Amino acid sequence: MHILILKKRINKFIKKFFKISLFVFIFSFISQPVKKKWGAPEDTPLFRLDIKVLEPLYLLF
C-alpha cells in the first residue's frame, strides 16, 4: 500500500518535471533566434525573462 502511494507520487513528479522541462526547452528554442537577431542577448527583455523563468524552475528541482 505504502509503495503504491510512493510510486504515484514519483510518477506525478516525473510528469510534472517533464512538462516543465519541455516548456523550458520550447521557450529557450523560441527565444534563441530572437537573441541572435538583437545582437546583445543581455539587453533583450526576453533574455531577462528567460533568467526569471528558468532560475526558479531549476531551484525547484
UniProtKB/Swiss-Prot annotation:
One Gene Ontology cellular component annotation held by this UniProt entry: membrane
Localization terms from the record: Membrane
Main location: membrane
Transmembrane segments: 13-30
Domain of life: Viruses
Membrane topology field: Single-pass membrane protein
Keywords: Membrane, Transmembrane, Transmembrane helix
Protein name: Uncharacterized protein 113L
